[in-house]
Amino acid sequence: TNASKFEDPYEGMVPKPNIEHRVEKVQEIAGCDQDEAKSLLSFYDIEGVTSRTFVNCWNISRHESAALWEQYLESSQGVAVTSQVRDLREAILTDEDVKFGEIEYIDYNSDRIPEGPIPPLYHKRNSFEHENEFRVSLIPEKENNPKDGKYVPVDTGKLINEIYLPPSSRGWFFTLIGEVIETYDVDCEL
């Protein structure tokens, strides 16, 4: 998914203390006032990186989350796939520079993060802490026109350890998913 498509307006953004630090540095180096420094910084908008970045999000909890089923599933017809981080890394079949990491949850009004284009992609507001997120990100070098998503080939045999169905799913859905697993020769537990 393109990182700019998430509902959270803070997704990929820089926290307030980072912005304040940048403004102070620009004022110091350029010898200008605060408004001029903010104007200069607006040319280096982090949203440009966010709109060119693709992410894949995983929950790293040891158990299912009712909150996540509720948040991300509009009906009882969906699945959750389990994997291990090493399997996820090995399953992604691309030569592009893929980054992996746990999300750090912060207060965007008081916490500062490391500088650079990657750290904003691995920090979220404390209110999302229940997601317990692990993220995979990819910033393609040659993507001039951002899209909603990007195809990245994966080895599903390495990737999928188990498939979970939502607690509200019906028997027919269990049967259907079992048939899909059998048809595509997916070696995993259901």
Give names to the regions the model predicted.
Residues 1-190:
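Partner-binding and oligomerization surfaces adjacent to conserved cores of proteins
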